[in-house]
Design a protein with these regions (language model features):
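Beta/alpha (TIM)-barrel catalytic core signal, keyed to glycine-rich beta->alpha loops juxtaposed to Asp/Glu
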Residues: 122-287
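Surface-exposed, active-site-proximal loop segments in enzymatic domains
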Residues: 79-92
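N-terminal binding-site loop/beta-alpha segment at the start of enzyme catalytic domains
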Residues: 1-70
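Alpha-helix N-cap and loop-to-helix initiation/capping positions
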Residues: 20-24, 50, 54, 89-97, ...
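Short, acidic/polar
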Residues: 19-32, 93-109, 130, 153-157
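Active-site groove signature of glycoside hydrolases
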Residues: 106-125
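A short, structured active-site edge motif that brings together acidic residues
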Residues: 67-80
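Acidic (Asp/Glu)-rich catalytic clusters
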Residues: 2, 58-70, 106-110, 139, ...
Length: 287
């Protein structure tokens, strides 16, 4: 499956964030596609199980054909909300729930198929054989075109990769969250051809004041002048340079910020600059 270089994350489109109107969603979809972002990331739980429906209404109102975009969704998290009055957040990867979740997403997103469906988080009770059989059933029915996972470590990916092809893994990865670079996650994905999608790709840079971010900021001031771009573009281009071909999932609903994110994919950091930025994040030289 080929995705756009930047993926538009929809978690904050609805009541969990910017509470966009149907018209605003429609315009955002149209503008995103115009600027080259044709892939939209969803999860059944976003907006307390309401954001997919909002997107679907916006898609119908837009001038965009379904075939011109790619829709990703995630299932498995049972999240207490008005639409799901349960007491305990948990994970459900039973056959019935997987099928029901995918079918609900199809209805809400106003589509006949999902380009990729992801297990939202690993569960200590996930049954690999039952999940693989169910996903294969969905693939054969053409309700989904590919299968992926989210927040999986190399061992968990390996278990499923022996049963069913994993197209992608959504992971938390940024200049302030380097675990996937060092714990073998990106190494494994690169060796198996699994596409990494990075959620929260700007990390904690704009959210926290600490020594790490102060060091990073000093380098960004230097390199945004050299490359004639913004701080955010340096943060994204630093991720994109990784040979595993990381695709940032960007959560902005502002079209100028989205275009800025797309433009970051054309910035090719020099090797020594990439390591200088890494050194600022870690706080010491590479070993």
């Amino acid at each position: 499956m080929n995705y756009s270089k930047i993926i538009s994350g929809t978690m904050n489109w609805g009541i969990w964030g910017n509470n966009l109107s149907t018209k605003q969603v429609s315009e955002l979809i149209e503008n995103s596609v115009e600027f080259g972002v044709d892939t939209f990331d969803h999860a059944d739980i976003y907006g307390g199980y309401t954001t997919e429906e909002l997107f679907g209404k916006g898609l119908i109102e837009s001038k965009i054909d379904r075939e011109k975009i790619k829709l990703i969704s995630k299932f498995g998290i049972m999240y207490p909300s008005d639409k799901l009055p349960i007491k305990v957040k948990h994970y459900d990867y039973s056959k019935d729930h997987i099928i029901k979740s995918v079918e609900n997403s199809l209805i809400n997103l106003k589509t006949d198929y999902l380009d990729c469906v992801l297990m939202h988080r690993p569960s200590p009770l996930m049954d690999i054989n039952k999940i693989s059989d169910t996903v294969n059933q969905l693939l054969e029915s053409e309700k989904i075109k590919s299968f992926g996972v989210s927040n999986f470590n190399p061992q968990q990916m390996q278990m499923f990769n022996n049963k069913i092809k994993i197209d992608c893994n959504q992971i938390q990865c940024s200049l302030t969250h380097l675990d996937p670079i060092y714990d073998g996650t990106l190494d494994y994905m690169q060796s198996k051809g699994i596409k990494p999608m990075a959620w929260k790709p700007l990390g904690e840079f704009y959210l926290k004041k600490n020594d790490q971010n102060n060091r990073i900021r000093e380098k960004l001031l230097k390199f945004k002048k050299k490359y004639n771009c913004s701080e955010s573009q340096i943060l994204l281009s630093w991720l994109i340079k990784h040979p595993s071909n990381i695709i940032p999932v960007v959560g902005t609903t502002k079209i100028d910020r989205l275009k800025e994110s797309i433009d970051s994919s054309s910035i090719n950091l020099e090797l020594i600059d990439w390591f200088e930025i890494l050194e600022a994040s870690v706080g010491k030289r590479a070993p």
